[in-house]
Amino acid sequence: MSDKMDQKEIGKTTKDELALDVAHRESHLEATPQRPEVDHSKLYVWIADSGNDRIQKFDGNGKFLYQFGSSGGTRPPYVPGEFKTPSGVTVDAEGNIWVADSGCHRVQKFDDEGDFLLEFGTEGWGQDKFYFPENIIAESMGTILVVDTSNHSIKRYDDDGEFLLGFGYPGNFDGFLKFPTGIALDKEGNIYVTDRDNQRIQIFNEDGQYVSKFGEYGFEEGRLNFPNGIAVQNDGTLVVAEKSQNRLQVFDRDGHLKEVLGEMGKRDGQFNCPTSLALDPYGYLFVVDTINQRIQKFDPELNFVAKWGVIGKEPGQFKDPAGIGLSWEPDWAPTEG
């Protein structure tokens, strides 16, 4: 038998062999581990619907649940429960909702039904004053951090609105800020701030002391062009939303680029002015895609999963959504092992 014939015979596959190969591959696919199904109906997504002067609540699948708030704030004294361009929202461990009521230069607190509880802050500079605060986040110990954007500072308050701590001054030195916008926390309580007009991310410890920074202005991947939102994954990886560059960039804690996601557009996974981010306990990422008037949802590998929202004033619609906060049913989140 010739070498050519040997090669031909060796390369042949019988019907029985083909059937066995298909069966093997199918059984292998069935045995591949799959991510457990996450019931996002028990997760709640709170949106500061800035242009409609209200807070909207959805489940994690985008189902509208309810809303509260109305337009107000033409001049002080401002009416409790009314808003003027609310820009940030967070939910504390007790289920209370805190809103950075940016245009009224104050913070408002509501119960989980949207009933008004308290307010604090007036326009100005000082411990109990704000100037267009754009974001807010609840800490594990029951305190809240307010991003006092146009005062270039971060301020901590207790659950009664009493001032505890402030840090940040106008400037570009380490620990100084220039129009900070986004804020996030890691498991150790470290504070991550998007120092927007300084084109960088700054990290502070839980006492507000400067730790480190990274970032440099530019359009290339790895550089920053007006970073706005930030979120910290369970492993310490950082996701940064650049509203001027219409993309998300993923960095390690030292600022080394790991991944870039998105571009300008309206399709799934594209963005037009992404402003705020939130991560759920399972690693799903929610993005406020402001000019596209929608929320986009991504899985832990940053694959597009879902979206919801169109422009309008009806329940479930948006007009320039700005802030996002998450809460969930007791025992819904995974336990740390």
Where in the sequence are the language-model features?
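Eukaryotic scaffold repeat domains enriched in small/polar residues
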Residues: M1-G337
